[in-house]
Amino acid sequence: MRIRLDLAYDGTDFHGWAKQGTSDLRTVQKVLEDNLSMVLRETVELTVAGRTDAGVHAAGQVAHFDIPAHALEQRSIDGDPSKLVRRLGRLLPDDIRVHGVRFAEPGFDARFSAMRRHYVYRITTHPAGALPTRRHDTAQWPKPVELERMQLAADALLGLHDFVAFCKAKPHATTVRELQKFAWKDVSTDIEPQVYEAHVVADAFCWSMVRSLVGSCMAVGEGRRGSGFTAELLDASERSPMVPVAPAKGLSLVGVDYPSADKLQERALETRAVREFPDASASLKLDDE
């Protein structure tokens, strides 16, 4: 049977989501799998919606795992996966919280059924830096910026494009993505001035893409790059060394959207299939991040 997890974590002290072979590096996946395997007395292997990098946080992460029915028959669970929330709450470290566990709907795949991922990037340009209470999720940029310039740079990136200039290379993976939303907002307050948030939504993101999108807009916002910088990067055929990558600490995965229950399997099959970019001469395998 398939179980769905809804979870959150502070990525500060993790080496990203993915476990790294036999390494003892602390990753979110390793900590969760170790604890789930101990509770359920079965080997658990997680599939996740967004494989976040080192230092990146999540408030709305989704994962799934498959397990035999008898693993839930122990007295403390009694066949009800939601009871794992309390068990895990007692075992997991303070920087991971599983806030929902339930039977997955037929055809559900945390990664391939996803329609879109929502990220928020939070950054301050104030010389004092972030508030101590927001130091883990707010990055610092060394120069002041103009919000209007950043938004124009972001608008130029919306739609279906090859974002190779903004992505770190990964074998057999396409860099074609549909960027559905890229909106900047001034969220400053009297006690926290010069703070900005970028809300970024796409069907999927390739490795380091969100932080590269943010860094490029910040470069335009501070005047280091011209207003057409981001649009020009869409014509690139490889990753551009001119693209600054914003710090990991400002980025949080805040949500994952899925289709209705009757469309879950169809969506998973579509995502797994070869996706062809209209202007490309070859088809590439989609590899969601």
UniProtKB/Swiss-Prot annotation:
Active-site feature positions: D53 (nucleophile)
Enzyme class: isomerase
Protein name according to UniProt: tRNA pseudouridine synthase A
One record GO biological process: tRNA pseudouridine synthesis
Gene3D superfamilies on file: Pseudouridine synthase I, catalytic domain, C-terminal subdomain, Pseudouridine synthase I, catalytic domain, N-terminal subdomain
Similarity annotation: Belongs to the tRNA pseudouridine synthase TruA family.
Organism per entry: Corynebacterium glutamicum (strain ATCC 13032 / DSM 20300 / JCM 1318 / BCRC 11384 / CCUG 27702 / LMG 3730 / NBRC 12168 / NCIMB 10025 / NRRL B-2784 / 534)
Keywords: Isomerase, tRNA processing
Binding-site positions, substrate: Y119
